[in-house]
Every structure is written in C-alpha cells, then in structure tokens.
Amino acid sequence: MCESHPVEPAPEEGHTRRSFLTRVALGASTVLVPGTLRGLLGAPAAAAAPPPPGTNYLNETAYRAAMHLHAAFSEVTGSLSGHISQAIANGVGIVVPTDHDWRIQLRHYGGQYHFSNWSEPTPSGYWSLLRRPGVGSLTTTSGATLVSGGAAPADQTAGAGALRLVACSTKSSIAKVAYEVDSQTSNADAKGTVLGRVLHIWVKADSTSNARTYLGVQLGLANDPGYGPKQITYRLRTDLTAPTQPTVTGGNAVIDVPVLRGQWFELVPELLADIAACWPSALPEDNSLNSMVLLAVGDKVTTVSGLFSYLHLETDPTYDPAAAYSSVLQHYRVANPGLLVPNGMEHSVDTHKCQLGGQQFFYAYPDTGDPSTHTSYGSAVAADLVAQIQAHDGVASYNHPFGIVTTSPPIGAKRTAALTAQMTAVLASKCHGADCMEVGYNSRGMDLAGHLELFDCLSANGAFLTATGVSDDHVGKDWLAQNNRFVTLPWMVGLTEEAFKTALRVGRASVGLLGNFTGSLDLSINRTAYMGQAYCRVPSAADQVVLDAYGLPSGATVSLYGGAVDFGGVGFQRPSKIADFGASSFALGSVSAPAVGSGPRYYRFTVQDSGGAVIAFTNPVWQIPPGSPVAVPANRFVP
C-alpha cells in the first residue's frame, strides 16, 4: 500500500472544523484497526437539514481546481496569463501551474546549428531543418540549398556551412520559402522560456530587400488571451539605415532590422524588450520561444536570396531559475487576488511527479552522463523525489500513470496488457509514496475507464491515494474545447493553500469534466466517515452509504459502486454496482443505500450524462472493520 502522510497543520484562526477534521488529524503513522475497537459502535448519524448547495455538513465549501498546467517554461505555447484567463472564464478558483523542472532550469539546454546537413546531432538527439508551408506560387529556381564551406566567419566549426534561401514568385503577389530549425527529436531543447537564453544567428542578404521582399527570422512565442499565439518577424532590410518602431497586428509583430547587402550580420533579438514594445499589456517574462523559422519572401520583380549561418542559443550564466519562475507566479497572484495560485512543478523523472503547493525546490538529480537520458533514473530516485516534495510541504502527485505517449488509447488485448503492466508496476512501487494519482485523464496511453480501473486496483489492495482530475494543458486557451478537460473539485474550509493541500492529502475531492459537470459531490458512511476517510467501526445492518450531489445535469445518472479490499493484486475483485439513481433523486441533495458486505470495503460513485458517458466521479469512502489487515493512514482514520 502507499505510504502514510504527515499530519495537517492547524486550521487558520477564524475557521472551525467539526469533529470530522479533528478526528482524522491523529498523527503521521498508519493505524492498523485493532480488535479492541469492536465495542466502539455508534448508531448512524441522525438526519440533519441539508446544507445549502456549495457547502456541506462539515462546513466545507466546494471549489474548482485546474491542475497540471504547463505555461511558458514548458515546451509548447502555453502561458500563465492564458490559463488565468480561462480559469476566470470557467469559474475555476484554484490554478496550479506545473512547468517541467528541468525546463525551468534550462538543464541540458543551449544548442547550436552549423548548417552542415539537414539534421545535426546534439547531446540530446538531433536538430533538423524542416520545410514549412510557404506562401504563393514559387518559381522552379526558388527553394533551399545547403552551402558547404559557406559559413559565417564566426563559425569555425569543422564542416560548418550555410543555408541559402531563394524566393521568387511566378505572379505579382509575394511568395515565401520557410524552413524551421526544429529540436523535437532533441527533447525539444530549443523550446521554452525566453528568460535566461540569448539567440544568435548570422545572416547575409545577397539581394536588396524592403518591407515587401526580404530575408527574415520569425520567432514563435506563447499564446496570449487577448491576441492568441504571438510571433515576431525580424525583417532584414537593405533599404534602411536605422531601426524603426515595431508594427503590430494582433499577435503578429514585425521588427525591421537594417543590414548591408553582401555582408554578414549577427541578429541577436532582445526578446524581453521586443515583447514589451510590441505588446505593452503582456508580461514579457510569461513567454516562450517555440519556433525559429528562417524566411525568404520575394515577388515577380524581386528575387530574394541570402544565407543563414551559425544559429546558437546561449544560456545566460546569471539566470536564476527559481527567481525567474517565482516572479512570474507572483505577478499573477498579485494581479488576481481572488484566485489561489500555489507553487507547483512537474518533476519529470521516468514517472512524472507533480509538486502541488509547498516550498519551491529543484530536485538534485544524479548525473547520468548522458543528456539524452537525463530524466531516466528508476524507482529509487522517484521515491526519494516524492519524499523531498513532501518534506517541502508539498503534495506529491503520480502523473499520467500510463506514461507520456500521445497516441490514441489502446484497445482489445493491447489495452488489457497495458492495464496489467501498470497495475503490476504501481503495486510494486507503492506509487513511490505519492499522495495523489491523476485518474481524471483520458489520454496518454489509456482511456478514462482504464484509469478508474487502475485506481480500483490500488483501492482493492489497501492503497490510500487521492484521485485527481487534470488537463495537462500545454496551450492555455479554450479549455472547454479540450478532450482532457478534467478539474478537481476539493472540499475546503476556506480558499487557502493549507485547506487545498488538506483536501488532496485526505481525499476530500471529486473530479468533474469541465463544461459537463463542475458541481459538488460527496459520500459518507452514516455521515460519520466522509469521502477519503475510513469508517473503522464494527459493521451494522443499519449502516448507510450516503451520496450527496449538487449541480447534476438533466438526464444524469449516478452509479454507486462497492468493492472489497481483498489484496488480490492485479486479479483483484472488480467493484460491483450497488445502485443507480436519477438526477431527480437528488432534489434534496442526497440519497442513501445500505452498506453491503462485512469485510473491508470501499465505495465510490460516478456521474454519467444522458448518453452514458462518465462526466464525474468521487474518491472512495472506506469501511474498515476492527481487526482488518488494512493499514489506515492516521489522517484518514475515523474511529
């Protein structure tokens, strides 16, 4: 089973917790339910007037948390401003940014391209020159060639060359040739934050150029909630002798750079200053460098030709990753005081682990000596990493448990094999001691049903984790259009980081699919032990599982499941359905069903829409009779 968790700190002054929260904070050790507790029987709690929607019998409030969000320090186009904007638009009160740790650190970043070939080796793989869609109708003489020995004098590397681009249109309109320097097969190590890195590229214009026909370098930046994806095109112009003001249309900016025809010129964009000049309302530091595209744009009259050489990204030796990351988070905390934005980070070892809240830190990875495998370490390092997250007062999440593949989830025998393999792995590793697992997840190697079955396997084998729902969004726009748009719905005593971490550690959270369900769900045994907790009393025929649900969509069905804690490994007894309830059954907020069985068990429920698709689910509540061979974490134990 997974390891126990530390005791929660006392609630903030001014807040009260009922006996439920007092009882669960017993200590850091697990509690093996003793036979001496058999006399501590109590009748089911008396019925009480239902609380108003959004609150519960424990004086907790339901919140929405968007977790596992990648922004400008990661490898795609997300920005924290985009996530914040989407959170506000969708009524989400908790935003947990979790960029990759090694990308924030620029670990094994840098990189050079010498234009000696269409692909060049790097310490982590390969950078490549990839043709991108052009514009217009190009002549047959247009295109790209590598010029051996044609490198800029600054590149003294043996075999260094240059890329010649030629663009001429068959029509009066312009035509464009475009090639990207791509690092996808090198851990995407050219992509990431604009902070701490300086781009250099040498260019020689062999033809005249102007605002219409030119050589250019186009840099893709992060998404902006107001402008969409941003990009800056640096036009190299022989008709200018001095820089001009940028021209900006929405997310597209153009900066003209004077150059001399026939002479090498080193382009070194000052990205922070340029972003600030182009989009004054945006935070420049909340931007990433996502693409580097080399351009030649010509027309029928003017053939544009020129050379590109020695592209290299240098890491600033004064770059402070901790300060850089913290400053971006703090900017949005100050600007959005109504949101909770705790520290977060995805520590990206073999099995990625998110730190949710706590003090920011960077794990000291062992040096493998091989940059291409610098995130591959094994279970011992993963377990130590989780312990370090917890030592820094963070909640540790086991992320996308079926891996990082982005292909469609497997079906048939391949799906069964993937499930069996991962069940075996998490049982053997005890989830490395993590507090949570991403179960609300519908991609990366498995569908939602498979994630739920994996979590049932853990529950049936006596492992106490909290199931969360996440998006793993790297783009930061239009959350409702995403397939993987799960949010975690924690019950909290106030919108504070400590209350949030308590909910995650104790299992006081359900999961919903944003746009389909973001109400509130809870369940309990006799209104004594609630979702995430273990009811540790002698079973009684009068015991009831009580289901609370608010905000159910019309036509929804709630299905209650019960499963035995049988320690059956991957062959555990799958949970069985106890009852279905229509949405109208919850007119007063709750329904109940008899707690069946005599041995240790767990109960959870799902919400299906009118078409039968699961749109929400709860964490389990446990029924662990005295004398059961189940080690209950002290913070989940209810005598």
Language-model regions, residue ranges each:
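N-terminal secretory signal peptides
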Residues: 1-19, 28-34, 38-44
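Domain-core and long-helix interface of multi-subunit machines
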Residues: 27, 316, 345, 362, ...
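C-terminal functional module detector
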Residues: 49-62, 70, 74, 80-84, ...
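Extracellular carbohydrate-recognition regions
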Residues: 113-145, 317-318
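Short carbohydrate-recognition loop motifs
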Residues: 145-178
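Extracellular ligand-binding interfaces
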Residues: 179-183, 192, 200-277
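Extracellular beta-strand ligand-recognition surfaces/modules
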Residues: 201, 264-307
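Extracellular polysaccharide-targeting segments
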Residues: 295-327
